[in-house]
Amino acid sequence: MMDDTRHPTRPYPEQQQQPPGQTAEMKPVPDHGEKSYKGAGKLIDKVALITGADSGIGKAVAIAFAREGADIVISYLNEDGDARDTAKWVEEAGRKALVIPGDIKSEEHCRDLVQRAVDELGGIDILVNNAAFQRTYGDITDISADEWDETFRTNVHAPFFLSKAASPHMKPGSSIINTTSIQSRQPSPQLLAYASTKGAISNFTAGLAEMLAEKGIRVNAVAPGPIWTPLIPSTMPAEKAAKFGENTLIGRAGQPAELAGAYVLLASDLGSYMTGAVVPVTGGEIMI
């Protein structure tokens, strides 16, 4: 385990929330880069649509993109307070924030998200398919068909719906970034449904990269390890949430801010020779 005094260390207090969870109720509150991220003009006047941008990784990416010069569509389910806070940080960076609640399991809503980005912000240059649903289970017999379907519709169908709707509006040089997971390569049995969707997203990324290459649209993914977001205390038993991330080489859960740079890389000209790639940010866990 590595010593790191800049970030909260384990164990965290035992805690549990109702899904999808609220940032303000977490102990410690995640770091989204509010104080630490410094932009360098890598995304000047770009428009980015980010799902799950109200909290966690999506919030950190929204803050980073805004500080790099992008306007942001903040897509979220119903966590209004968290979404307003993200919008505040985007606007403090001098950029526009378009806040749109709704269920991305609906293809109609996904089409509306893209159309509003085009109509109200002038286009779409970056799509970040980040929102996800997960639950833990002790046995396959504990997983209902409805929960299996909800996991796939949120984690797999929605990125398909959004990529399908967005790609006709995207110019050469645009970028689609999917959030997969170390679970795509090292599935935990307790996360059977979630891990299955993340394996699907890794393959979706590779296939879509080939499909859109002739249009000049790059498609990549980021594979986080254990990251401290509202998803954790709202979907895991309290005792597991307290120890979350302790088995990594870093010895702790990652903070959302620690992933933002990977998304900036893939969204910007720094990643212009990258497509079909999966970038691991795992705290030292090896993706086999």
Where on the chain are the PLM-derived regions?
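Short C-terminal tail/terminal secondary-structure segment
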Residues: 4, 26, 34-35, 137, ...
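Residue(s) in the substrate-gating loop at a strand-loop-helix junction
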Residues: 181
